[in-house]
Amino acid sequence: KIWKSPIEGSLKYRHAAPVRMKKGTKYPLLVFFHGAGGRGADNKGQLIDAGGLSAFEKMGLRTKLNSHIFAGQVPKGEKWVNVSWSLLGHKTPEISNSMRMTMEAMDSYIQNPKNQVDTNRIYVMGLSMGGYGTWDAIHRRPDFFAAAVPICGGGDKSNAKKLAHLPIWAWHGEKDLVIKPSRSRDMIDAIKKAGG
């Protein structure tokens, strides 16, 4: 699908409804932010980047969890969050076009009653560049998501207090050569210091 923004631009995205839906029942939604390898214009890269969503499907988790899945695709040369991955920290920048349009398209999807989305069970996860996207999404909407799984990302530590209530399961490989593992550790430490 293609989302045409009422503000400016368009975004390619994929969504999948729960495998089994019953009228009147609400279902969880997983918003997925792909890594740099998923960028492009084919509306497929976000599904196969680093095994992300394709692994989710192969393991049977979509059927088991019976949830909606929503995944936008960042065009080549752009990012979910406009910051350098080599930095040891950053302040939340102006929202990127891809993040803005993903939020617009996601909101439209959620608000459509035929999709039967449970607004108390909206989860977000992403890897690498998408880990940054996950942190950015929860910084911008700390009360919107039920939980977050940022994998190999980094965020703005000054937002830690507003994230202290949110269940976060952060992952980062110690040998990551692209994004320093300290980016994830520093975020979790800041959230713990803020009471999380």
Question: What residue ranges belong to the model's regions?
Answer:
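Gly/Ser-rich "nucleophile elbow"/oxyanion-hole loop immediately N-terminal to the catalytic nucleophile
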Residues: 21-25, 79-128
